Amino acid sequence: MRDYSKEIKSWAAELGFDFCGISAADFLEEEAPRLERWLNRNYHGKMAYMANHFDKRLDPRKLVDGAKSVVSLLLNYYPEEPLDASPYKISKYAYGKDYHYVIKDKLKLLFERIQKEIGEVGGRIFVDSAPVMDKIWAKKAGLGWVGKNSNLINRKMGSFFFIAELILDLPLQADGPIRDYCGTCTACIDACPTDAITPYEVDGSKCISYLTIELKDQIPNEFKGKMENWIFGCDICQDVCPWNSFARPHSTEEFYPNENLKTFQDWDEITSEIFSHLFKKSAVERTKLEGLKRNIAFVKEV
């Protein structure tokens, strides 16, 4: 009898995914009270969409009819070197082409391969674009544990990964979760300049990533002097994590930074033309030029 789980993992590796794990597409019973508490505390800030589709976030069968399995995939984005020509900082995941495009293309190829090799298989691909609790599914699939900074941490390569899923109506052999290896470490909690992190929970409304990307209003004055020059996203809680000493540079060409971005220093004079040149098809497009200029102006104020 064919081992479809093993074959799918092999095909995922051929497409460049670093890790692939499988879990049964069941209701996430343990997560329901946690998600409800997080929302009730308004930790989602002004990300109103986080409160939508509560039932779908917890049950993949409401996203895909007849769902039997969740295939979780990790793709490394850790760069060879940080962009440090300028004092302003951009999260490492945004150095290259927008991950949505890159991973979606790979997932489509994987799904096509599954349908070609196995037959009539229904399902959907997800790349941070629907109400899917990707870190929880990756944890259930044994790809890592959710750390105190709420990121998925993999023992072999840390946490600088994109997470994606295929939810299929195909029954597959599920992998089991691994244990938590954070131990007594509080490096991420201690390092967060806005005090957004408590053990295993992040107050999104205080997170620098939220403030520089998701928040469309003015950044509250209480965060002045606390942004540490981050103008798009933030990597502090990952940079200080001991497990990221195992991070290795990725080999995905699309994630290599724009050559002009490596040396760019004139952030205070950035124009729409320069913005388009530096960030075409980049995740930074999400914040738009005005958002980036707002962030730059805010971090300059002390």
UniProtKB/Swiss-Prot annotation:
Subcellular location: Cytoplasm
PROSITE patterns xrefs: 4FE4S_FER_1, 4FE4S_FER_2
Cofactor note: Binds 2 [4Fe-4S] clusters per monomer.
TM spans (from-to): none
Enzyme class (EC, first level): oxidoreductase
InterPro entries for the chain: 4Fe4S_Fe-S-bd, 4Fe4S_Fe_S_CS, QueG, QueG_DUF1730
Record domain 4Fe-4S ferredoxin-type: where: 170-202, 221-251
Binding-site residues, [4Fe-4S] cluster 1: C182, C185, C188, C241
Catalytic activities: epoxyqueuosine(34) in tRNA + AH2 = queuosine(34) in tRNA + A + H2O
Binding site for [4Fe-4S] cluster 2: C192, C207, C234, C237
SUPFAM superfamilies from the UniProt entry: alpha-helical ferredoxin
Active site: D128
GO molecular function: 4 iron, 4 sulfur cluster binding; epoxyqueuosine reductase activity; metal ion binding
Cellular component GO terms, alphabetical: cytoplasm
Cofactor: cob(II)alamin; [4Fe-4S] cluster
Pathway listed: tRNA modification; tRNA-queuosine biosynthesis
Keyword list, A-Z: 4Fe-4S, Cytoplasm, Iron, Iron-sulfur, Metal-binding, Oxidoreductase, Queuosine biosynthesis, Repeat, tRNA processing
GO biological process, one term: queuosine biosynthetic process
EC numbers, comma separated: 1.17.99.6
Function comment: Catalyzes the conversion of epoxyqueuosine (oQ) to queuosine (Q), which is a hypermodified base found in the wobble positions of tRNA(Asp), tRNA(Asn), tRNA(His) and tRNA(Tyr).
Protein name (Swiss-Prot/TrEMBL): Epoxyqueuosine reductase
